[in-house]
Amino acid sequence: FPAMPLSSLFANAVLRAQHLHELAADTYKEFERAYIPEGQRYFLQNAQSTGCFSEVIPTPANKDEAQQRSDVELLRFSLLLIQSWLGPVQFLEKAYANELVFGTSDRVYEKLKDLEEGIQALMRELEDGSPRAGQILKQTYDKFDTNMRSDDALLKNYGLLSCFKKDLHKAETYLRVMKCRRFVESSCAF
């Protein structure tokens, strides 16, 4: 992110987060369509709702809770969520090498790195300007399993994609809340 006005930094970060969240949601839906029998979807979705690693990070659960946090806190949460996926996403391409729909996974990593840099640029702007070492995650998500013939691998990857979608939704929400707080505009209703 080159030097630019704060409003542009926020606008770019929100657009990137929104795009990644849409990509994660589309990938999840496509995986579900391709691999999960329709009769099992509801049961499996409920079973995975508590299995996300990010739930151990004390992040705001919704927009109202996010509005009660400072911008710097929300940026830190967003950064932690993004960084927790940098490693696992690199295995998406390997897990789905022969699947056309998952062919964008190599770009997902680049897009996550780009969003990470954007969030770090916002943190530098909002803090005292000096780069601070962020909280380093000792634990992240498991890698995606490349053995697509195994039911266990399918269920694991389905759960990971569900968490990926949820975490990117959180990061997008936090960035939107901050942007709307600072720059009131018509697109703040979400």
Curated annotation (Swiss-Prot):
One of its GO terms (cellular component) is extracellular space. The modification Phosphoserine is found at S105. Disulfide bonds join C52-C163, C180-C188. The lineage of its organism: Eukaryota, Metazoa, Chordata, Craniata, Vertebrata. CDD domains: somatotropin_like (cd10285). The gene is GH1. Plays an important role in growth control. Its major role in stimulating body growth is to stimulate the liver and other tissues to secrete IGF1. It stimulates both the differentiation and proliferation of myoblasts. It also stimulates amino acid uptake and protein synthesis in muscle and other tissues. Zn(2+) binds at H19, E172. It comes from the Eukaryota. Belongs to the somatotropin/prolactin family. It is found in: Secreted. Gene3D superfamilies: 1.20.1250.10. GO terms for molecular function: growth factor activity; growth hormone receptor binding; hormone activity; metal ion binding. Pfam families: Hormone_1 (PF00103). Keywords: Disulfide bond, Hormone, Metal-binding, Phosphoprotein, Secreted, Zinc. This is Somatotropin. GO terms for biological process: animal organ development; growth hormone receptor signaling pathway; positive regulation of growth; positive regulation of receptor signaling pathway via JAK-STAT; response to nutrient levels.
